[in-house]
């Protein structure tokens, strides 16, 4: 079994916006713009995490929107060269722990049927 890449999971800040916006453009056909990310960072009902590599570059990120007692994972993206290292799993585990601690009724993530890596 291949050794997993070491990352630190931390809350996303304004310092991460450029790298996250670039990651959006790389990973999605309809990416969120930098301005959309700024707006979501300012949303009190949203939380965003980044996975930082050993050089403090963004290897991946994920977003969560909480509405009443419901959790909606809005985004999960990992740099192509960093995939298959458990990064998305680590990001999602933080949200799962949050959902359990705050007794959310559910936590959802929509994935395209063609996204076999996510399924």
Regions found by a protein language model. Give the residues of each.
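Acetyl-CoA-dependent GNAT
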Residues: 2-4, 8-83, 89-98, 102
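Conserved hydrophobic beta-strand within the GNAT/NAT acetyltransferase core sheet
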Residues: 73, 106-111
């Amino acid at each position: 079994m291949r050794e997993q890449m070491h990352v630190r999971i931390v809350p996303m800040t304004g310092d991460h916006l450029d790298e996250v916006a670039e990651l959006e453009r790389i990973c999605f056909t309809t990416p969120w713009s930098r301005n959309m990310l700024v707006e979501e960072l300012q949303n009190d009902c949203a939380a965003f995490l980044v996975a930082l590599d050993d050089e403090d570059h963004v290897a991946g990120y994920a977003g969560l929107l909480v509405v009443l007692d419901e959790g909606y994972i809005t985004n999960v993206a990992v740099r192509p060269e960093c995939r298959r290292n458990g990064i998305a799993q680590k990001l999602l585990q933080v949200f799962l722990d949050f959902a359990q601690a705050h007794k959310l009724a559910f936590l959802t993530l929509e994935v395209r049927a063609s996204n076999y890596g996510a399924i």
